[in-house]
Amino acid sequence: GIVNVEDIPEDIKLSEQQQFAVDSAKHANEGELEIDKLAVQSFLDLLTYPLYHFDFETFQQSIPEFKGVSSYQQIPFQYSLHIDHSDDSLTHKEFLGEEGTDPRQSLVEQLVRDIPLNVTTLAFNASFEQMVLKGLAKQFPQHKDHLLNISSNIVDLAMPFQKKHYYLPEMKGKYSIKIVLPLLVPEMEKAYKDLDLIHNGGEAMQAFAMLGEMTDKDLIRRYRESLLSYCELDTLAMVKILKVLKG
């Protein structure tokens, strides 16, 4: 029988996905970057400027404290927005809810001011942002049209990696931002490690849920600053990934 991927004969019949996996494994040590330049360019052609790089942070409650929320529903409490102007200059906007309160209404009111109608918004694995926006549109019908407009104009930055139009064998067929970012923008890995208290989405979720119980004002301030720094880095990471795609 065949034990190693190297032993698979060249003439064996495989599905497209299997063939891709075999080729990737065979060339994994060669570090060959594969770019479908036409496909990447047609992705870049979807983008209009100014371009809104967008990321939500959410938390969940097993027993909901807020009106209209079900158990374990994703409740957005924070977002970061890097606005990428056509001349490569950036504007940063952000929102972080007040601890111990329902952050949704304030978040929605600022979001519809920060992201105008009919602009291109970029998110990584955009289905998550779209799910949260659609949930908010139901909960805040007065802003429904604007929120659904943002959702329908989201472009997924994961697309070129998911479709393997930009592929490194080290990705091993995976395309999450945790896989893509260190390969394309290695210096960002250190930036995340250098953050103070929050280094990933799980820590952000736990921190916001805990903040309402905290009494130490210095610690609250430190956690809030850490949350803002972490979320800002997430959208800056998207700016950097896009820059690599543009070549």
Question: What are these model-derived regions, one by one?
Answer:
Residues 180-247:
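Acidic, Mg2+-coordinating catalytic module of metal-dependent nucleases/exonucleases
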Residues 39-117:
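Conserved RNase H-like, two-metal-ion catalytic cores of nucleic-acid enzymes
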Residues 41, 50, 71-75, 98-109, ...:
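Conserved structured core elements
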Residues 92-204:
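Conserved DEDDh/DEDDy metal-dependent 3′-5′ exonuclease domain
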Residues 54, 155, 233:
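Single, functionally critical "micro-switch" positions that shape active/binding sites
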Residues 64-66, 165, 243:
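Hydrophobic alpha-helical membrane-insertion segments
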Residues 1-50:
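N-terminal accessory regions of nucleic-acid-interacting proteins
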Residues 56-58, 62, 81-85, 124-126, ...:
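Active-site proximal loops enriched in glycine and acidic residues that flank catalytic Cys/His/Asp
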